Swiss-Prot record:
GO cellular component: plasma membrane; side of membrane
Function: Cell-cell adhesion during development.
Residues anchoring lipid (GPI-like-anchor amidated serine): 298
Signal peptide (UniProt feature, chain positions): 1-19
Species in which this protein is naturally found: Heterostelium pallidum (Cellular slime mold)
Protein's UniProt keywords contain Thylakoid: no
Domain of life from the UniProt record: Eukaryota
Annotated protein name in UniProt: Cell-cell adhesion glycoprotein 64
InterPro entries for the chain: Diff-Dev_Assoc_Protein
Post-translational modification: Contains 18 disulfide bonds. The GPI-like-anchor contains a phosphoceramide group, rather than a phosphatidyl group.
């Protein structure tokens, strides 16, 4: 899958248990361990300031609020390193209208009211699609990384040109391949290469059926009994439990080809940016995986994925 999968959140943050245990849900203000807990909706597990002894489930500041404590902002806003205020920054791409330079993505300048890559058609300092126009990818032409139009699904691709496949597609077996097209036992490099709606995910390079949920699971950094898009949740939120039950973190049937086709069309029509914020073109593109997310905690939209899920629903898409 292309580099855009640093992609996603709209609703969630990823947490992977670091010891053999199950995951529990934690309320705002409570001490948390990002390797074993899931903070409730609207909070993240972070030290609220540099002198805090513990990480807690904390509500991050948002636009125009003080971020001097956590040095991070909600809604993908940028914590200005000087003012320590959450601001809009780096959210516009090549060709979009700007009034100040910090609106443009890093490596771009605001010239004549537009965000410009001064070395175009070279991809520029970002070495990514951020230096390219909407409808273009960044690929090696034998000499340098240059911006070129995307190539269609079904067209030939290789290591050098894989960056020209659509951002939500992958270069699989030498062909730009649309997501969700992989049948059982077909080759894959990412979960989204497989037909998720049919309960498939990518395991050891093959589209594989998600097994029946386990009722006696544990999670470690390298081994997770829960496979596919699932999390090992402790029974009755009991933080003394050592085993739990696998809970689906998405509604598999909701992740359809039609939804991905719409997502693909939206992403291709927008320029890439350093940070996707509310004013970014990409903010209107809803990843179907985010739309299909389940709340594994009754009051939480923060989701824990197992160690093998190469997917993060985050709204900061640095290499989209």
């Amino acid at each position: 899958m292309n580099k855009f999968i640093t992609l996603f959140v709209l609703l969630a943050s990823v947490s992977v248990a670091m010891s053999a245990t199950c995951l529990t849900c934690v309320k705002e203000g409570a001490v948390c361990d990002a390797t074993a807990n899931i903070c409730e909706e609207g909070t993240v597990c972070i030290k609220p300031n540099s002198t805090a002894a513990n990480t807690i489930c904390f509500v991050l500041p948002t636009l125009n609020e003080d971020c001097s404590g956590p040095l991070a902002c909600a809604d993908s806003y940028y914590c200005n390193t000087t003012s320590k205020i959450c601001v809009e920054a780096y959210y516009l791409g090549v060709g979009e209208s700007c009034s100040s330079e910090n609106q443009c993505s890093t490596s771009l300048v605001c010239t004549g009211g537009k965000c410009v890559n001064e070395v175009y058609p070279l991809c520029g300092a970002s070495n990514s699609r951020v230096g390219c126009k909407a409808g273009e990818g960044c690929a090696f032409n034998g000499t340098a990384l240059v911006c070129s139009p995307f190539i269609a699904n079904g067209a030939a691709c290789n290591t050098s040109t894989s960056g020209l496949c659509h951002p939500v597609s992958s270069c699989s077996n030498g062909v730009c391949t649309a997501p969700l097209t992989g049948a059982l036992n077909s080759n894959c490099t990412s979960n989204t290469d497989c037909n998720i709606a049919n309960g498939l995910y990518c395991s050891s390079g093959k589209c594989t059926a998600v097994p029946e949920a386990l009722n006696n699971c544990t999670t470690t950094p390298t081994v997770d009994n829960c496979l596919g898009y699932s999390a090992c949740m402790c029974p009755s939120n009991d933080d003394t439990a050592k085993t739990g039950s696998c809970k689906d973190t998405i509604e598999y049937s909701d992740v359809t080809s039609d939804a991905y086709n719409k997502y693909d069309s939206c992403v291709v029509s927008c320029p890439a940016v350093t940070i996707v914020q509310k004013q970014s073109c990409l903010s209107k593109c809803t990843n179907p995986l985010a739309g299909a997310a389940n709340n594994v905690c009754s009051s939480a939209t923060t989701i824990a994925f197992n160690a093998f899920v190469v997917f993060a629903i985050v709204l900061s898409v640095l290499l989209f």
